[in-house]
Amino acid sequence: MYKNKTITCVIPSRMSSSRFPNKPLAKILGRELVLRVADSAKKSKYFDRIIVATEDQVIKDLVESEGYEAWITGKHYTCNHRVSEIASDLECDYVFNLQGDEPLSDPNHLDYIIEYGIDNELDMVQPIRKTLEGDNENPDVVQVIVNNGKVLYLMRIPEVITENVYPQLGYYFYKREVIDDYKNLD
């Protein structure tokens, strides 16, 4: 909770990644990736609840065996659709979508994103970073075209390189009703 606002962290995770199948169960220093992400989320000062959202029973079983909450969802092409599916069933003011492949998330960064979003009364926060050499040619780095602080477009390989293209970070922070409405955009 931050400023009397409840915050649920949802970690979307699936086994069928095209670039790295079974990625959530890959071990990092002896612990599965999805658990490392949940462990990072647990260090935030503000999350009232942490839920792993998955279409895979094996992930749900693993997560629950470690004391975390997990929900089964339908199959989805994007993480935001997976999070949106469960958003209407959440009793919270905000939802933080923490990507299931972000095991090195600094809890201070997560907390800053929450503070920034709530303090500025934003509907959504999607942080970006400086472009590094090779980012624009790397299909594993999602690029964002930004104009006046607003995200206009996301892509894997930029079709046009401009000064307004930045790599995104694997974090999305929403007012619950905003992510709940996301499923209606299809």
PLM segments and residue spans:
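Short phosphate-binding loop-to-helix
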Residues: I51, Q57-E115
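Short glycine-rich anion-binding loops that position phosphate/pyrophosphate groups of nucleotides
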Residues: M15-S17, G100-P103, T131
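Conserved core of the sugar-phosphate nucleotidyltransferase
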Residues: D106-D186
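Short beta-strand segments
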Residues: P12, N97-Q99, P127-I128
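Short, high-confidence coil segments that cap the C-terminus of an alpha-helix
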Residues: F47, C92, D119-D123
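N-terminal glycine-rich phosphate-binding loop and ensuing alpha1 helix
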Residues: K3-A53
